[in-house]
C-alpha cells in the first residue's frame, strides 16, 4: 500500500515508480540465489520508497536533502540553468527565485515612471535561475537586479531611490497581521479615492483639526501666522474639506515623507504657492521624531523675498522646496532710447530658476494673482515677445501665451517617466469694499460662505489654463481648488497679518488687510490633503502599471 501511495505522482507525465521498476528488474536478472534476490529486492524497494517520500516531502529538512538524492534515482527531474550553474547553488530553502551575483548585474532598460528595473519586471538574461519543475509542473521565472544606476535614479547620498510606484508598501517592521491590516485598510482608502471627485463637497467641522497646533511651527511666515498676530477666533482652523463621494484621508506626514524619501518635492509659483509650501513643511516637520534633523538648506531664516528656498528632512534624505516665479515666465527689463529702463514681462521665456528645478521628482506649479494687478490688467507697453514690446495686449491673451510657453517648456524638459507634475488652480480673494490696495477688507468674516450663489463665477483664466493642460504631451494633474476655496472668506489674515504695524498703518489699521493669502493652520492644509490623496492614487496607478508590465514580461 505504501508503494501505491506514491506510484501515481507524475513527473513530467511519467510514473516515477514504473521507471524505477524497470531498472530493478534488470538488476535482479543477474542475481541467482533466491534468498539473496529476495533480500536485495526488499532492500532496494524500501530505499526507493524512502527516496520518493523524501523527494516530495514539504518538510524543510527533507526538502534540503531532495536535490542530492533525486539527482541519482529520479532522472526525470530537470534542472534548468541559464548560466551553467550546478544544483549545489540551491540553498537550504530550495528556493526558485535567485538574485544574480554582483558581477552579473547588467543594465537592460531605463527605469519607467519612478520604477527600478526590478520593480517593472525587467529581467537579466544572464541571471542565474534554478527551477525545480516537479514542484508545480511549470517553470518559475527569475527576478533579476540590473545595475542601472544613473544620477537621476540615485539620491543625494548615492543610494538607489526606491521606485515611487513602490512607496505605498506597508512598514515591514510591523507584525505580519498588523502589516496585512494596514495594507488592506490602505487598499480600501485608495479604491474609494479612485472613483471620487475631490473638488465637489462641503466644509465640515472636525474638532481633531488642525493638523498641527497653532504656534507650533516656527517656520510660518509672519503674514500667515494669524493666531500669533492676535486673531482671537479659532473655529476657522477646525474645518476640513469633505468630498461628497468619499472622505479624504487625513494627511499622514510620516507616510508622505516615506513616499518622497530621497527625492525633491518642489513648489513653483507665487506667494499663494508659498502659502501651500509652508503648510506642507509644517505638517511634515511635526511628524518627524527629531525636528533638529529638519533644517533650512541655505541657513536663511528670512526667506520671503528670496527667489528660492529649501527645507531638508535629513532622516529621509529629501527636500521640500519653493521657487518664486509669480508669472511662471520671466520678468524683464528693456532700455528706452533715452536710457531709462522699463519693466516688461517676457511671454516667450520661462522663469530663470527653471534650470534648477527641472529634474525634481514632484513639481507643483501655480500662477494667477499677479495677473490681476493693475499693470498686467492694462497690458500697455508691458508684454514682450522677442524684441517686440506690445503696445497693448489683452491680459487673457497674455496669460494664454505665458502658459503655452510654460507648457512647452514642461514638455521639453520634464521627463514624465521620472517626474509627476501638478498644477494648483486659482485661489480666490475676498476683499470687500475695494481691492488689496484700495481699502478692501475681510476682518469681520468669521464664517465661510454657506450659499453657493455668492461664489465668484469661474474665471476665464482657469478655463484658459485647462485648455493649455489638455494640449500638453506631459500628463499634468490639475488641483482645481478654486471653487472649494471660494467658500472660505473667513480664513484670511485680514488685519492679523503682522504683529507690529508701521506708524501709518497704526493710524488706519483697517485699511491694510490681507484677504488673498491664508492663515496657517488653515485652508492650504486642505489643499495639501487633496494633493496627498492625488499622490496616493497616482502612485497606486504607477504601481499597477509596473505589476501589469511584470506579468506581461513573465508570460512572454
Swiss-Prot record:
Q: Name one GO biological process term.
A: cellulose biosynthetic process
The listed locations are: Membrane
Q: In which tissues has expression of this protein been reported?
A: Not expressed in trichomes.
Q: Name one GO cellular component term.
A: membrane
Q: Where is this motif: DCXHWCLPGXXDXWN motif?
A: 514-528
Give the residue ranges of motif GDS motif. 269-271
Q: How does it sit in the membrane?
A: Single-pass type II membrane protein
According to its UniProt record, where is this protein mainly located?
membrane
What more is known? Answer: Contains 2 motifs that are conserved in esterases, but it is unlikely that this protein belongs to the catalytically active pectin esterases.
Q: What does this protein do?
A: Can complement TBR and is therefore functionally equivalent, but may work in different tissue. May act as a bridging protein that binds pectin and other cell wall polysaccharides. Probably involved in maintaining esterification of pectins. May be involved in the specific O-acetylation of cell wall polymers.
Q: Which family does it belong to?
A: Belongs to the PC-esterase family. TBL subfamily.
Identify a single GO molecular function assigned to this protein: O-acetyltransferase activity
Q: Specify one Pfam family.
A: PMR5N
Q: What is this protein called?
A: Protein trichome birefringence-like 1
List membrane-spanning regions.
Answer: 38-58
Q: Which UniProt keywords apply?
A: Membrane, Signal-anchor, Transmembrane, Transmembrane helix
Amino acid at each position: 500500500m505504501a508503494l501505491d501511495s506514491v506510484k501515481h505522482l507524475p513527473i513530467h507525465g511519467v510514473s516515477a515508480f514504473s521507471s524505477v521498476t524497470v531498472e530493478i528488474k534488470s538488476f535482479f536478472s543477474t542475481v541467482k540465489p533466491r534468498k539473496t534476490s529476495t533480500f536485495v529486492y526488499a532492500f532496494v524497494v524500501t530505499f526507493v520508497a524512502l527516496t520518493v517520500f523524501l523527494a516530495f516531502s514539504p518538510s524543510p529538512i527533507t526538502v534540503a536533502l531532495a536535490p542530492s538524492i533525486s539527482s541519482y534515482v529520479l532522472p526525470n527531474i530537470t534542472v534548468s540553468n541559464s548560466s551553467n550553474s550546478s544544483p549545489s547553488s540551491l540553498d537550504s530553502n530550495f528556493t526558485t527565485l535567485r538574485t544574480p551575483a554582483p558581477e552579473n548585474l547588467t543594465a537592460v532598460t531605463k527605469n519607467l515612471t519612478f520604477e527600478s528595473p526590478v520593480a517593472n519586471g525587467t529581467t537579466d538574461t544572464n541571471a542565474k535561475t534554478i527551477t525545480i519543475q516537479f514542484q508545480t509542473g511549470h517553470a518559475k521565472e527569475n527576478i533579476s537586479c540590473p545595475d542601472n544606476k544613473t544620477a537621476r535614479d540615485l539620491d543625494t547620498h548615492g543610494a538607489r531611490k526606491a521606485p515611487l510606484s513602490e512607496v505605498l508598501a506597508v512598514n515591514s517592521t510591523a507584525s505580519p497581521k498588523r502589516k496585512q491590516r494596514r495594507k488592506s485598510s490602505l487598499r480600501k482608502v485608495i479604491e474609494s479615492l479612485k472613483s471620487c471627485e475631490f473638488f465637489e463637497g462641503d466644509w465640515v467641522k472636525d474638532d481633531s483639526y488642525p493638523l498641527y497646533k497653532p504656534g507650533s511651527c516656527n517656520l510660518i511666515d509672519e503674514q500667515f501666522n494669524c493666531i500669533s498676530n492676535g486673531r482671537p477666533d479659532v473655529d476657522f482652523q477646525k474645518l476640513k474639506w469633505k468630498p461628497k463621494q468619499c472622505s479624504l484621508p487625513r494627511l499622514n506626514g510620516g507616510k508622505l515623507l516615506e513616499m518622497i524619501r530621497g527625492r525633491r518635492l518642489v513648489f513653483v509659483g507665487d506667494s499663494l504657492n508659498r502659502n501651500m509650501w509652508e503648510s506642507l513643511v509644517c505638517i511634515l516637520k511635526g511628524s518627524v521624531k527629531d525636528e533638529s534633523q529638519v533644517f533650512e538648506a541655505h541657513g536663511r531664516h528670512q526667506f520671503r523675498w528670496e527667489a528660492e528656498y529649501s527645507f531638508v528632512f535629513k532622516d529621509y534624505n529629501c527636500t521640500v522646496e519653493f521657487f518664486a516665479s509669480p508669472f511662471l515666465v520671466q520678468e524683464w527689463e528693456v532700455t528706452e532710447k533715452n536710457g531709462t529702463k522699463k519693466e516688461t514681462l517676457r511671454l516667450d521665456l520661462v522663469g530663470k530658476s527653471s534650470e534648477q528645478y527641472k529634474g525634481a521628482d514632484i513639481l507643483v506649479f501655480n500662477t494667477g494673482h499677479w495677473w490681476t494687478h493693475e499693470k498686467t490688467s492694462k497690458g500697455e507697453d508691458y508684454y514682450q515677445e522677442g524684441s517686440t514690446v506690445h503696445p497693448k495686449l489683452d491680459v487673457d491673451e497674455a496669460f494664454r501665451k505665458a502658459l503655452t510657453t510654460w507648457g512647452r517648456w514642461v514638455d521639453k524638459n520634464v521627463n514624465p517617466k521620472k517626474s509627476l507634475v501638478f498644477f494648483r488652480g486659482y485661489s480666490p480673494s475676498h476683499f470687500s469694499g475695494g481691492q488689496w490696495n484700495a481699502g478692501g477688507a475681510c476682518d469681520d468674516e468669521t464664517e465661510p460662505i454657506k450659499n453657493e450663489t455668492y461664489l465668484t463665477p469661474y474665471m476665464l483664466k482657469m478655463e484658459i489654463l485647462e485648455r493649455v493642460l489638455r494640449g500638453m504631451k506631459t500628463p499634468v494633474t490639475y488641483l482645481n481648488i478654486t471653487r472649494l476655496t471660494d467658500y472660505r472668506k473667513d480664513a484670511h489674515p485680514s488685519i492679523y497679518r503682522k504683529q507690529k504695524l508701521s506708524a501709518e498703518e497704526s493710524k488706519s489699521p483697517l485699511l491694510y488687510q490681507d484677504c488673498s493669502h491664508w492663515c496657517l493652520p488653515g485652508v492650504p492644509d486642505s489643499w495639501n490633503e487633496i494633493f496627498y490623496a492625488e499622490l496616493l492614487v497616482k502612485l497606486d496607478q504607477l504601481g499597477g502599471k509596473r505589476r501589469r508590465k511584470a506579468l506581461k514580461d513573465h508570460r512572454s
